């Protein structure tokens, strides 16, 4: 695409203000990078990065992009683990970082937030009104509410306990790819029945429009109780989760696990005594103190079905925070000392143990690398297993990085198909398009392509993500 950068810079400056347009190479490279381990290609590097402040500026930007046929890539925080954030073609990156207003309406039962707010910022504001944000990404310090809702990710939250983000969305302000600004949903706390365009945009991964205002129901801040359980093996934790669903026991809000290796790494990193085996961490909630305490005691009794070495309610918040931090530190250790090639496996509950064993075999038998170490953790109660191939070096070729990413992606997605899963956390386009086709068929994929074309006839927004890439 032949673009006059000088003219582009001036044109964009008229829309968002020249101080909010960057076309220098260092900035463009930063916005092209994401969590993927391989090098950038020239096509990933945008012509310009713009930071609009409102829906009207975004509307003008998208109308301009349609006129010039220049792709626009939406950027929240760039934390996608399936390549959603890396531009697939040269174009304009639309950074939502300036859009950080939030308004809380307790008398109406909802709040409205702009997409550039980090999750932790929204939580802090809602806490002033004794309300909870029902979004739980591990990257809450940097993840934005716009990106989280656009992917509809549950992250740490167990879907069966509270639901997904979209279950709390009442409506949006959206700028369509062609520049029109629309309103969806309701200002009542009762969501629309029937055809509700709001649902088109929840989980749409930025393909159908730019979310510029998100209206969500206020959720009263519950009381929490935290539980930790130590087991000889990861299989004991898996058996407990399977039995929980079989008995119809209401799941905890959080139900995390560290396998034997991850538990050792994580606990050592935070200064805790090394556990004998695997570790499970749970958080239960209720809207009364007595209710949460009773729920925790009952769940603690249930946990003995899996014969834990020890299971206890952690009443000291500092102790709990240290235990909880061990999960993140297990991942940080791997990132510091080598490279990880990961997966998101969300099988049918009764196939959870089989999926775990198959994931171990995938890492053990990688064709592109011998002797990779298997390490796993994740949201086992959801259920989601993050199975990783850990390689204790960063000194591998760019081609090998791609090959390992692709091999882990394809083989773990085959497990999702084999065991009835989909992907409850990372989204379903970009690197997952081949899985989407295999799971749901070409007919459904073509329906999505036609839907995208109806909303975005010039394929302006997030071009390439629906086509798939590696």
For the regions a language model picked out, list residue spans one by one.
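N-terminal flexible segment immediately upstream of the FAD-binding catalytic core
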Residues: 1-63, 80-109, 262-270, 317-341, ...
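C-terminal substrate-recognition/cap domain of FAD-linked oxidoreductases
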Residues: 23-34, 229-231, 238-403, 407-414, ...
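Short, ordered loop/turn segments at secondary-structure junctions
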Residues: 76-79, 99, 138, 260, ...
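FAD-binding subdomain of flavoenzyme oxidoreductases
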Residues: 100-105, 109-256, 460-461
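Activity-critical C-terminal alpha-helical subdomain
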Residues: 180, 429-470
